[in-house]
Each structure stands twice: as structure tokens, then as C-alpha cells.
Amino acid sequence: MNTSAPRKFNHPDVTARGEARASVAFRQLETLWINTGTLCNIECANCYIHSSPTEDRLSYITAAEAAHFLDETAALALASGSGLPEIGFTGGEPFMNPDMLAMAEDGLARGHKVLILTNAMQPMLRPGIKQGLLALRERYDAALTLRVSLDHYTEALHDAERGAGSFAKTMEGLKWLADNGFSLAVAGRTTSGEGEEETKERSGYAALFAREGVALDSKDPSSLVLFPEMDEEAEVPEITTACWGILDVDPGAMMCATSRMVVKRKGMAAPVVVACTLLPDDPQFELGASLAESLGAVKLNHRHCAKFCVLGGASCSAS
């Protein structure tokens, strides 16, 4: 007789306990993420997307391919009567993609706010990239925001995650951005994300910013975004339809209610759309070749849905 317990996150509609699995209806497109590719200049100890200098399972997307989706966002905004969404670029390290500046300028020229997630290390600090960024800032000012990944406010813990010397290089990039008047945010990691521990972490970042002359308000959750750690082995509950009321959480506040991400898989002829930034590889979250195909409900059939979004309360957008 088979006595093994049902596996969690195994059925799109039903949890291991036989309860109805929660889903999130699409509300409106507020952020369109474009994954620039999984190649990165460093390899972090706990990278959720497993980027590295050799990891190219998500290929560089081109400016022409990105433009196709920007065209579609304009059509969707016109049809729905909503404003243009923010365009977010993530990787990998976006500044390794040779079309990064061109894609950012295309989005800005169309009237989008543009957010680029970066480690602010050598790919961003190359002279040509710096010159291009300065030109974009001069032309579009605060419509362009760069969010710098700084895992901890101490060099020791940041470098434990990202490698020796990474803290110093990231601080060089962060200070260059601050000194040149860019709209900035910082993304860090938190072990608990609540209460006294988060207050301590925000105070630590505040001291660092003050010491380095970086004008960021560490108390503002949009200026300093603290993400929960994403432990693949951690025990997490499945999210049922009853959980929204029990937890007093609005499904409309989940990332997948208001955002989608474009990825280009290695060897594929064209990009596809996935539900969110956290799940680029799971086939059940690949929603189609166009934005129009991708706007259905998303079933929360993954541990990241529970830990990172519903329970962690995280969002990747700038707002």
C-alpha cells in the first residue's frame, strides 16, 4: 500500500490537502518586465534565477524584439484606457546585453517609466555605458530609475553572497549614479522582513548611505526594497482560496495581477511571456507568445508564489 503523502504544488487546481488552490486574476498591466538574458558578470551563492558568467539558457533579447512588446503595450493601453506601464529590465546583469541602452531609450522615448535592475559593477561602469546613461538621464531625468542590488550593508555579508570585492565595486557604481543625479533605489535581502529585524537592517543601510553620501531614504520601502530569502528547501504552505481572507491579503496586490515578463529561451526563434520575474523556467507559467495571450488568471502552484509573494509581501516593481 502506498502511504506517501501527496506532494505539495503538484496539481494546478488542488492542494495536497485537497483544497481549492488560489489563483490571481489579471487586473491591468502596470509593469512589463523584459529579461535581458541570464548571463551575469558574477555568480551569487543564492541567485533565484541561477545567473552566472556562463549561464545563457535565457538569451540576450534584442532591441527589435523588445520593441515588438512595447508596440503591444501601447495597443493594450489604448484599448483599456489605462496609462502606459512601467518597463522593467532584469537579468542576469542587464548591462551585459549589448542592446540595453537602446532598449531603455526606446521605452523612455515612448513615454514609459523605465527601471533597470543592476549590480552596478563593471558592466555598468564601462565608459560607453556610463556615457549612454548620462545621456538618458539628461534627456529623460527621473523617468529612468536604476535599482542597485546590495545584499547587505556590510562588506562581509554582501561579499559572502556575491564574491570577494563585489561590495566595493557595487559601492563604486552606486556612488557614481548618486553623484550624477540618477533616480535610484537599492534592493537588499532580509532574513525576516518584519519587526525589529527589518528596522535594524534599514538602520544599517541608512548608516551606510550617510557615510557614502548616497541620498536614499532607507525607511522608504520603494527606495530600499528588502526581499525575503528564497530558500528552495524551506517548508512553505500552499495558498488556498480561503487564504486571502485568513491572511487579509488582496490578490490584486500580487505581482501577477499587474505584471508580466518577456523572456527569450536559448535556441528559440522568438521570445515568450511568463507570469512573473520569479518563474522564468517553469512551463506552467509560460503564458503565450504575446501579451494578449498572457492576460488570464495565474494559478499559485509554486512555492515562490507562497513564500515570496503572498506571505513575503514582495513586489519587484518600482512603485
Enumerate the language-model features and the residues they cover.
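Conserved C-terminal portion of the radical SAM core fold
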Residues: 80-88, 114, 140-147, 165-236
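Eukaryotic acidic, serine/proline-rich intrinsically disordered low-complexity regions
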Residues: 1-8, 230-232
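Canonical radical SAM enzyme core domain
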Residues: 54-68, 94-140, 146, 150-172, ...
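Conserved alpha-helical substructure of the radical SAM core
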Residues: 6-90, 95-105, 110-112
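Accessory C-terminal segments flanking Radical SAM cores
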Residues: 209, 228-319
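A short small-residue
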Residues: 50, 152-154, 184
